[in-house]
Amino acid sequence: MTKLFIPYIMGNKSFIKNMKILDENGADIIEIGVPFSDPVADGPIIMEAGNRAIKQGVTINYIFNELSNNKDEINCKYVLMTYYNIIVSYGEEAFFKECEKVGVYGVIIPDLPYELTQKLKHKISKFDVKVISLISMTANDDRIKEIVKHAEGFIYTVTMNATTGKNGTFHPQLKDKLKHLKAHTDIPVVAGFGIRTKEHIKDLATVADGVVIGSEIVKRFCQDNNEDTIHYLKQVRETLDTL
């Protein structure tokens, strides 16, 4: 099975252009962050990018409109990472209906506990949009089995007990946790948070089915040097393809 490359970008005024670059340079699934005023799971790079997007006037409606206008030009799958407050404000059913309409493959909601996620999934089950499960390093075996049983799309394993973007300070039991998860499910188990270098990728993707890279890609797009960014993306893809 090909290892999944899941880059994260901020939903800003350039996000469609950035999606096209990612789509053309090895991404399997693109994660689009919806800017939010209190992003509890985000590190400083993504938080600053979100604040800039808010100042640009980017809203969930802007993101939906841009996806609607450009969905035929994006070949890979894309998911939204959004805080629950945005979904509630929009209206749960209306939000997922719009996601389906604009081609969103799945939604990641980092601040919604598992039990409430299950209730939400029941409410929006008529829409063809997956709710992606996050599993933290602190989850015990019973909780893991329960989450895995209902997981869809892919499982996003948080590699550390911290916000995004820390440099490679992965939890010491991460690989064991990944192996344990993979033994209980057939859907891809990916690792995210703090992955940046070729060494990180090689280290984790030997066990995981893929990696999510966020802060490093957000930082590179903010620097607006597309040539360097494309070189980095190709390196990531090549590294994953050797595993």
Swiss-Prot record:
Pfam families for this protein: Trp_syntA
Reactions catalysed: (1S,2R)-1-C-(indol-3-yl)glycerol 3-phosphate + L-serine = D-glyceraldehyde 3-phosphate + L-tryptophan + H2O
CDD domains: Tryptophan_synthase_alpha
Disulfide bonds: none
EC number: 4.2.1.20
GO CC annotations on file: cytosol
Protein's name according to its UniProt entry: Tryptophan synthase alpha chain
Organism field: Staphylococcus haemolyticus (strain JCSC1435)
Gene field: trpA
